[in-house]
């Protein structure tokens, strides 16, 4: 019977422990926090966005951080395989907008409890509040781990410690230290899926205002580098929300380039309308409210908190009577509605990121098996590896699939 130690009780570690146990290994899971699945519990606003119902090829497209590394893992363990495993264990799921999959109960706790039940069923030995201090390696082969309590001998070890985001959940970069101890290279650790800090101070006045069905573009070198449609929100420091988090990957990439210059953001508040149609819509509203002041004539078009700002950005007196607004001024308002400008100051720190970009270098891991090329019997799974995806369930699927593959290769190497 193979002895397997899994370090970390997040999505990747839980899957690796369950599958290795199911396939007949003697599994010990070591978690440094007081319970497992802590970070899973806060994904999807506490509902746990387990995966996405899209085609598996779309998972690669939605993983800008080294998505191609996951081809092998996704071939062996798909979103359908994951949902079947959870269904067989008694967890019902549902699909929401954008293909996002959640537990039918809307409770992340049910996902964690399902994995706890499976681990108990397969005899996984779970140790809580027991951080791993070092890996034991003899002549290029892993032989176990040392914790602050004792030494565990093993035939295989899976590092599934997560990244550096949300350190309160336990992901404080321990896995990087462990991998580096045995010779692995750690790539530049940085935030991904993180709010964006802007130069403009007026964002404070809009704090808490959410925008739906808008298009956000990232602009650098006079060119749109990336854009996304969906929801965003203003904060005291800048902007956040699903499309902001996803575009933060592009912003971070641009920030690391030399001579990139200013990175701008462009908010299109009316992406469904062409400039001509929008102008006609403005004309219609202006005809209706022709005797009012401009500040009082745009309430049908915009949230009230945005109106003064758009007028100011357009450079027009808000008290000006609408029947005195020129065609050029009206078109300038239309332009601002579709090109509301912001300037990137930076990203919030990695501790506030949903996902960490960077990690253990993938060059030193086999993408078909998740085994280290440097240390036999050592595996990496989940966010500790240099992989990061957009929001929508893609990061958790990457964790589940890599955890699955690591466990299957440990227990059935002949099948690879």
Predicted features, each with a name:
Residues 47-95:
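Glycine-rich active-site loop/strand segments that organize a redox cofactor
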Residues 75-156:
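Feature captures the FAD/FMN-dependent oxidoreductase FAD-binding
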Residues 156-202:
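Glycine-rich loop(s) and the adjacent beta-strand/alpha-helix scaffold that form part
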Residues 21-45:
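Glycine-rich FAD pyrophosphate-binding loop
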Residues 127-130, 134, 308-388:
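A glycine-rich dinucleotide-binding beta-alpha-beta segment and adjacent secondary-structure elements
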Residues 5-7, 30, 132, 145, ...:
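Short hydrophobic core segments
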Residues 3-29, 406-411:
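N-terminal Rossmann-like FAD-binding beta1-loop-alpha1 element of flavoenzymes
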Residues 34-36, 41-42, 50, 56-57, ...:
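An anion/pyrophosphate-binding glycine-rich loop and adjacent beta-alpha core
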């Amino acid at each position: 019977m193979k002895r397997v130690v899994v370090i970390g009780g997040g999505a990747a570690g839980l899957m690796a422990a369950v599958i290795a146990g199911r396939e007949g290994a003697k599994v010990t899971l070591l978690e440094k926090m007081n319970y497992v699945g802590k970070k899973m519990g806060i994904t999807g606003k506490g509902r746990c966005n387990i995966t996405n119902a899209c085609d598996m090829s779309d998972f690669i497209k939605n993983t800008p951080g080294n998505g191609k590394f996951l081809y092998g893992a996704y071939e062996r363990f798909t979103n359908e395989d994951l949902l079947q495993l959870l269904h067989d264990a008694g967890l019902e799921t549902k699909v929401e907008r954008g293909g996002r999959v959640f537990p039918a109960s809307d409770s992340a706790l049910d996902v964690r409890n399902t994995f706890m039940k499976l681990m108990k069923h397969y005899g996984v030995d779970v140790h809580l509040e027991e951080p791993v201090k070092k890996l034991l390696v003899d002549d290029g082969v892993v032989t176990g781990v040392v914790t602050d309590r004792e030494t565990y001998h093993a035939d295989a070890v899976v590092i599934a410690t997560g990244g550096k985001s949300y350190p309160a959940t336990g992901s404080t970069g321990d896995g990087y230290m462990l991998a580096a101890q045995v010779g692995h290279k750690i790539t530049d650790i940085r935030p991904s899926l993180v709010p964006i800090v802007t130069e403009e101070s007026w964002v404070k006045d809009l704090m808490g205002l959410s925008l739906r069905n808008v298009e956000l573009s990232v602009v650098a070198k006079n060119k749109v580098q990336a854009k996304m449609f969906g929801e965003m929100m203003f904060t005291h420091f800048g902007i956040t929300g699903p499309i902001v988090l996803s575009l933060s990957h592009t912003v971070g990439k641009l920030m690391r380039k030399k001579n990139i210059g200013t990175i701008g953001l462009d908010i299109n508040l009316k992406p469904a309308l062409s400039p001509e149609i929008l102008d006609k819509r403005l004309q219609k509203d202006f005809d209706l409210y022709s005797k009012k002041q401009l500040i009082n004539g745009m309430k049908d078009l915009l949230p009230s908190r945005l109106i003064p700002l758009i007028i100011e950005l357009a450079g027009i007196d808000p008290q000006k009577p609408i029947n005195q607004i020129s065609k050029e001024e009206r078109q300038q308002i239309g332009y601002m509605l579709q090109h509301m400008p912001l300037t990137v100051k930076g990203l919030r720190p990695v501790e506030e990121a949903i996902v960490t970009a960077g990690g253990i270098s993938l060059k030193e891991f086999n993408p078909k098996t998740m085994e280290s090329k440097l240390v036999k019997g050592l595996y990496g799974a989940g966010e500790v590896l240099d992989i990061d995806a957009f929001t929508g369930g893609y990061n958790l699927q990457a964790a589940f699939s890599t955890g699955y593959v690591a466990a299957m290769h440990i227990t059935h190497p002949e099948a690879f």
